[in-house]
């Protein structure tokens, strides 16, 4: 897809991978609707518009979608389901509220956003949905059972829906990033983000690579990891 002039929705746009993705999309000529609970600091661009949205609530997603079409036009070409969070802890001491918060954001929010854009993408017979899963969607991790469960769900959802919509000219790509230097690790005891991790810009670059593939070329899954993940010295 030639991204020049195309409309892209990016969830979780305020920081990390979402913010980096919005910036790279803008550099490629896209019009970006940034959805998030807070506006990204320092992102000023005539092709960027922020829409306040908490993806945990379907009515908020529906309102953000309506507002996006009203402001940017009916056609929606790209959805990057990036909004997500991780909370660590052993299952037998885990907060039920935290469990629900992760599923409401990482799984239910992704479903609400995907459901919102699909009718328009089907009318266009053109679209690309990118779901940000995690290495945690491919293997279990001690004290991260809840987060892994959400990302396994994203993986299953992505691999199923791509088969549903491929004949409508809609691509679905699922990314499985390893450790990336973002605020994600702020809430993970014993793990600190460091420069040996991948950078948000690296993941954003991979997203744009998948988006810019020729029409009949479809990248379904992308796993990515840092080459030298341990902090040196």
What is each model feature region?
Residues 90-91, 98-100:
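Substrate-binding pocket helix/loop in short-chain dehydrogenase/reductase
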Residues 53-63, 96:
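The beta1-alpha1 cofactor-binding region of Rossmann-like NAD(H)/NADP(H)-dependent oxidoreductases
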Residues 114, 150:
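Active-site helix of classical SDR
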